[in-house]
């Protein structure tokens, strides 16, 4: 059971004051706030375990961004190595799910070798202030200026999926000897899992044109968004050893030639196909009560149609019951989305055109329901997890007081703005800690015995 805990801390920071606007959904009014502007197409945004937004920019930069202040800490600059043109550049990124013990970051990007545009997937290690390349997992993937794919996701079995586009070569998605136009599955060291459809190949599914969204929902289903040509953008369910039709089939199997191909080639039809096209980008599952219109639904950021699509599924998760479009034209083209544990939604914008005519003019926006008040979900046998931390702000060398209700036990973790763990204490009931740390903004996290978590900011003056 997930429990949501409110700890109210006011931090006065001039940097945190941004222009705000409101957006009406059905019955919920969302407040938007500019988190960070001046970005060069934020292609991937991830809510990190340090409560920062991790971001790739297409021209070749990776940063951690403080969602409260917008402060950007550059971890990696490969702009001299990354090939950026049209849709190519630094694209997908994923963090190791056990980041505290394995601070690995996986990043996919395009590069030039002679006159050839290629893709590679590299594993980096987070040092606390930067990213250091460790291994190249896959390289020499045929690329192009468009149709790159490059969305990454790590599954519960510690294997990783990577989407590759057709690289404008329609002969490759149906060629099982090519990794182009596919969903690839690999171990986290780049080796081939023995239970892949072909244990000698990374290929997990075939017939993809340009899949740019992959998400594993709580129901265990892998959903994927994919760009069609001039018709038939798709939302799919990904399955191993399935063929998704391209280039013979776009959208549904609904013509005689397509029907014949689908029957012979194990084609999986999409849940929905869009004509005219909408240009779907990334997807994510929203499971927080603060925005009822989004709760327990799949969100899709949309580029061409400049909106956020919200899907409700049947109980089995294999059929769409309702589809709603929100935020139409409010932020322009929407490239990516991530969600904070508080339920706040963060959107990466992509300007008003598919061409990057205005570099370093893109942004990350925050959406929140300011009317929402978190409540406790408890049972009679389980006491509420209540905690008070004071003073905040706190002076250097001063004692921090932590009060846990009913002598509960919890782990207290304090991180600096680079994500380094500076304090890790097991506490019970009332605890006093002497803070021997430098002045600055820190982030603390409580993890209780029954898995309840809460993180907030702490200012040391």
Task: List PLM regions with ranges.
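Conserved blade-ending motifs and adjacent loop-strand segments that build the rim/top face
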Residues: 320-341
């Amino acid at each position: 059971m997930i429990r949501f805990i409110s700890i109210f801390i006011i931090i006065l920071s001039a940097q945190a004051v941004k222009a705000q606007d409101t957006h009406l959904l059905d019955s919920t009014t969302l407040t938007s706030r500019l988190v960070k502007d001046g970005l060069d197409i934020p292609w991937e945004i991830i809510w990190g375990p340090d409560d920062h937004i991790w971001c790739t920019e297409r021209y070749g930069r990776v940063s951690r961004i403080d969602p409260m202040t917008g402060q950007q800490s550059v971890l990696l600059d490969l702009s001299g190595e990354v090939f950026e043109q049209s849709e190519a550049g630094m694209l997908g990124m994923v963090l190791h799910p056990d980041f505290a013990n394995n601070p690995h970051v996986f990043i996919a990007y395009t590069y030039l070798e002679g006159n050839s545009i290629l893709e590679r997937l590299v594993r980096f290690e987070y040092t606390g202030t930067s990213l250091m390349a460790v291994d190249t997992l896959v390289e020499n993937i045929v690329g192009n200026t468009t149709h790159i794919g490059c969305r990454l996701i790590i599954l519960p079995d510690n294997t990783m999926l990577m989407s590759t586009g057709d690289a404008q070569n329609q002969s490759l998605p149906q060629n099982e000897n090519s990794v182009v136009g596919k969903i690839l599955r690999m171990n986290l060291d780049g080796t081939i899992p023995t239970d892949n459809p072909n244990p000698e190949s990374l290929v997990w599914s075939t017939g993809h044109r340009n899949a740019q969204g992959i998400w594993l929902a709580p129901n265990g289903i892998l959903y994927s968004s994919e760009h069609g040509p001039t018709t038939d953008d798709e939302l799919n369910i990904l399955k191993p050893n399935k063929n998704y039709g391209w280039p013979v089939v776009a959208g549904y199997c609904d013509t005689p030639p397509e029907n014949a191909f689908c029957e012979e080639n194990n084609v999986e039809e999409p849940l929905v196909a869009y004509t005219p096209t909408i240009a779907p980008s990334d997807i994510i599952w929203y499971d927080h009560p603060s925005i009822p219109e989004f709760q327990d639904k799949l969100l899709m950021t949309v580029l061409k149609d400049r909106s956020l699509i919200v899907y409700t599924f049947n109980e089995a998760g294999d059929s769409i019951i309702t589809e709603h479009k929100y935020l139409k034209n409010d932020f322009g083209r929407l490239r990516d989305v991530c969600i904070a544990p508080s339920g706040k939604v963060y959107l990466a914008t992509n300007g008003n055109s598919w061409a990057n005519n205005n570099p370093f003019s893109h942004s990350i926006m925050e959406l929140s329901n300011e009317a929402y008040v978190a409540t406790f979900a408890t049972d009679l046998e389980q006491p509420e997890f209540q905690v008070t931390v004071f003073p905040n702000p706190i002076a250097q060398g001063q004692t921090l007081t932590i009060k846990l209700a009913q002598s509960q036990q919890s782990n207290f973790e304090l991180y600096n703005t680079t994500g380094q763990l500076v304090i890790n204490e097991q506490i019970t009931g009332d605890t006093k800690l002497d803070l021997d740390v430098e002045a600055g903004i820190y982030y603390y996290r409580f993890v209780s015995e029954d898995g309840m978590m809460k993180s907030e900011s702490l200012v040391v003056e």
